[in-house]
Structures are given as structure tokens and as C-alpha cells.
Amino acid sequence: MTRDKYDFLVLLDSIQGIWYNTNLTRKGNIMKSFETLNPMQQQAVLHTEGPLLVLAGAGSGKTRALTHRVAYLIEEKNVSPWNILAITFTNKAAGEMRERVNGLIPQGADSVWVSTFHSLCVRILRRFIENLGYESSFSIYDTDDQKTLMKQIFKEREINGKLYKERGVLGIISSAKNELVTPEEFALESKKDGSARSQQIAELYKEYQVRLKKNNALDFDDLLVKTVELFESCPEVLDYYQERFRYIMVDEYQDTNTAQFRLVSLLASKYR
């Protein structure tokens, strides 16, 4: 990313943030809804500075507290919606959260970035993936695409289909990516292990990634892996999103894997 492009994006975001801050006309109304929360939920809402982990059982109102916290930040703390990121695990949950926030604060709520981990990463990568040697028009491979690609690799390498199954190999690769284990790291561990099977899978993992990049494609797990790689290799891009997302909330945080945890940690490391 060129410096001019970075400066332009920062300026654009600043202008939008100022616009929303000067158009919040319902400040104080959120407190009426706040009174319907139980004491523990209220504590979670009022804690606006520094890390906070909310642990509670299913159906206890964690998501409700999170959406009220978003509204409280905007209406009572005068935080720009532009600076708030709320992450969920499913598109359905993201849609429900948007509806809840809109119900609490119609003014400016649309500018709160509510999304799943993967949709967040897609938007970031569409903008900056050229820094990693991909084109911004990259394809996202679904399960069928992945299986077709792996079948091609199996055929060309004359892999015994009785000993190795495409679905099984892809599952192992997916698990490795979720733990941010690169093909090189996987190969190193397989050599230490001494297993011929693990070494074969390491070769398949390596070739699979080579083919994906050649096709200008990412699989679902790559969306997280490549966003983490982007942030770690391009400090100016990370800084841009750290400035953008000064308040980050993750629904069902206890379910995050290593890649998701690393992504959130990088984004939140500047403002804690």
C-alpha cells in the first residue's frame, strides 16, 4: 500500500467518523433500555475501557449485553459508530445483532461494522491483499472447489485413493490453518514425527497452497490466515485498522480458534 493511499483512507475514515459524531441526536435514550438489564449485564455495558471477558451460560443474555454496550458507547460515550467492530460466528447472528443495534440507536447504527470473522477478512483482503502477491479479485473456494483441486493433485501425484481420501487430507490441512501452521512448519513437524503418512500430507498441503495461489484463490480458512499474515507483514495496514476499530467486541469469544484469537489480538493491541 502506498503512503498516499494510506493517508487518503485515514482522511476518509476521519471525515465519516466526524459526520456521525455530530449527528447523534438521541444521546441519553439508551439509559431507558439499560435499566431493563440485570446488574451483571449492566456492569458489562458500563465497562468501556480495557479488555473484558464475559462468561455465562447459553441464553443468559451475553449478546444482549454486547448490543447494549455498542449503543452505550455511541450515545453516552460519544464514540463514533465508525470506530466500533462487533464480530459474530454466523451470518444469522450478525444479522440479528445489526437489528438489535438498529432498534436501540437508529441514528448512525449502520456504520457499526458487524460481521462474521470471515466476512470481515474478505473485506480487508479485497482492499489490501495485493500486498501478499494476490489480485484483489481473488476467488473463494468452497468445499467442492477444494475437493476438485485436491483430486487433481492426487491424480498428478498418483496418490493411492485407498490410503488417502481428499476429504480427510483437506480436514487435516484445515486444522493446521486454524492453528496458523504453515506448510513449511507442517513439513518440519512431519519430519520430526517420522511418519510417512504425515510427510505425504505435508507435501500435499504444500502443493495445495501453491495451486491456490496460482489460481488466485483462497479457501475459507485462508481468509483468516492471510489476514493475519497481512497484518504481521504490513504494519501500515494493521495500523490503519487499529485506528479504525478502537472498540472491538466478539460474541462467543470462548469459541475462537488460534487464527481468530491472533486476528483479534493484533487488532486490539494498540487500544486496550
Language-model segments: residues:
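Short amphipathic alpha-helical boundary/capping segments
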Residues: 32-36, 57, 156, 160
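SF2 helicase catalytic motif II
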Residues: 243-258
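N-terminal pre-P-loop "Q-motif" helix
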Residues: 34-48
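Conserved RecA-like helicase ATPase core segment
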Residues: 32-36, 52, 62, 72, ...
